[in-house]
A protein has these predicted regions:
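Conserved phosphate- and dinucleotide-binding cores of soluble alpha/beta proteins
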Residues: 92-93, 100-182, 189
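Short, charged/polar "capping" segments at the starts of alpha-helices
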Residues: 26, 86-88, 156-159
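Fold-independent oxyanion-binding glycine-rich loops
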Residues: 20-22, 51-52, 80-83, 100, ...
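Short, solvent-exposed amphipathic alpha-helical segments in soluble enzyme
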Residues: 34-35, 65-66, 133-137, 164-167, ...
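SAM-dependent methyltransferases
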Residues: 1-20, 179, 184-215
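Glycine-rich beta-alpha loop segments
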Residues: 1-79
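Acidic/glycine-enriched connector segments
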Residues: 55-119
Length: 215
């Protein structure tokens, strides 16, 4: 790991957050899925943000490290680590690590730094991260150009339920689903990420950046 005291988060870098389970093991399909996606993110010279822990967080940081083969690739892997008594292993290949005692503070940093949010399969913590992002997107506390990419078929039932229950009962609006994308492979995920990156790279002075908007 590089000296985290000397590294600073570059506000001009495009960053992709990946949320997912700490319980997923190497060799599982989802681990490889996240590893491959993170590698592509690095190859496209985008920063990665993860929880900096085991499981899919580890898959993300390892994949991102593997993708930085170009000499002038200046992308970074950022770990926002929550201190838990049962989850002490820190992910490898983090360039910058921030430690948190409270989930709320950690989530706020994720929101401030992320240009795209990718949600891999996970449990209560991952679902919290998904709905926290979704809620802030709905009320425009973060930029309304942030895509939420859901990886794998696990999320299909949840989105079906959101349509059949809250949407049908008019508890949410159709537009609340506009930024939700279900994908099962890396290419469509990267297509969405690259579209967002293209908008970011235009450098329009009016482009919404969470690092400026979310406090």
């Amino acid at each position: 790991m590089k000296n985290t005291k000397k590294l600073r988060i570059n506000k001009k870098h495009f960053r992709v957050a990946i949320f997912g389970s700490a319980r997923t093991k190497k060799g599982e399909k989802t681990y490889q899925f996240v590893h491959n996606l993170a590698k592509l993110i690095a190859e496209n010279e985008m920063d990665l943000i993860s929880g900096g822990g085991p499981g899919l967080m580890d898959a993300a940081s390892r994949g991102h490290h593997l993708g930085r083969t170009k000499k002038n690739n200046h992308s970074h892997s950022i770990g926002l680590v929550i201190k838990l008594p049962h989850e002490q292993t820190t992910g490898y290949h983090l360039d910058l690590q921030r430690d948190f005692a409270k989930f709320s503070n950690r989530l706020d940093d994720f929101m401030k730094l992320s240009n795209v949010v990718v949600v891999a399969p996970g449990g209560i913590g991952t679902i919290l991260e998904l709905f926290y992002t979704w809620q802030l997107l709905q009320v425009k506390h973060i930029c309304d150009n942030v895509p939420i990419i859901l990886l794998g078929p696990m999320w299909n039932g949840l989105i079906d339920w959101m349509k059949k229950q809250p949407l049908n009962k008019k508890l949410i609006s159709k537009t609340d689903l506009d930024n939700i994308f279900l994908v099962n492979t890396c290419p469509p995920a990267m297509k969405i990420i690259n579209i967002a990156k293209g908008e970011f790279d235009k450098g329009d002075k009016n482009i919404c950046l969470n690092i400026k908007k979310y406090h």
